[in-house]
């Protein structure tokens, strides 16, 4: 019985590791994309750079932004809003990654 349990645990750990690999790579890609496309106005930590604050860039760590739906954030990234340019040329999975990354910036 113990041998079966050991095999099940080993398989489960290996499976979890394999599943985590693409997610980690995706998270790294989203982080790099955020730094290249968003951090200029929103800063690396999401609180807003000096220039971004002057232009009205949102602080991604606030409850207001974190309370937006994924669809709302996706729409803003895709189509722009106010002074924020649109990024509709990004792939859907890149935009989804940015939304997920923004979620990690909450206070």
Where are the regions a protein language model picked out?
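Post-cleavage N-terminal segment of exported redox proteins
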Residues: 1-27, 72, 90, 104-107
